């Protein structure tokens, strides 16, 4: 299965995390599945991991953050998506995530973000063969 996780899921995949997103990364990395990422997702994940709230939660050093990003790159196929038209009306910053899934021919966009579950976004994804799932839903299906 070809999977694009959004930034929040990628953040929760770090080595100090123990929830479903971390287990999802392990299944994808060591299974027949494919992780699809973009420079946008990698840069945003790195930036978010430095936020004070994330630092309080995970206490990742700069080296550990770099290792997390490098680890993601080592198991992912990187695509450079082109954002063609707005898809996520409530948060246009989410459009690069959608187009990473489209251009990477993903089957699943993994997210907990409500904006991705809006009917118009779901329909756009469906037209491109993409299902929107939470990390827990995706874990159950793998």
Where do the protein language model's features map onto the residues?
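Residues at secondary-structure transition points
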Residues: 19, 36, 63, 88, ...
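Short, well-structured N-terminal submotif of metal-dependent ribonuclease cores
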Residues: 1-37
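A generic structural signal for short hydrophobic patches within well-formed alpha-helices
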Residues: 10, 42, 54, 116-117, ...
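Short secondary-structure boundary segments
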Residues: 7, 39-40, 112-114
């Amino acid at each position: 299965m070809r999977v694009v996780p959004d930034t929040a899921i990628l953040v929760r995949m770090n080595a100090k995390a123990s929830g479903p997103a971390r287990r999802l990364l392990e299944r994808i990395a060591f299974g027949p599945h494919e992780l699809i990422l973009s420079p946008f997702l990698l840069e945003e994940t790195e930036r978010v991991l430095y936020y004070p709230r994330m630092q309080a939660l995970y206490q990742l050093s700069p080296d550990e953050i770099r290792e997390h990003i490098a680890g993601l790159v080592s198991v992912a196929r990187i695509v450079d998506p082109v954002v063609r038209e707005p898809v996520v009306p409530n948060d246009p910053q989410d459009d690069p995530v959608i187009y990473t899934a489209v251009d990477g021919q993903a089957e699943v966009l993994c997210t907990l973000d409500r904006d991705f579950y809006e009917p118009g976004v779901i329909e756009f994804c469906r037209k491109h063969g993409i299902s929107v799932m939470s990390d827990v839903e995706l874990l159950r299906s793998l």
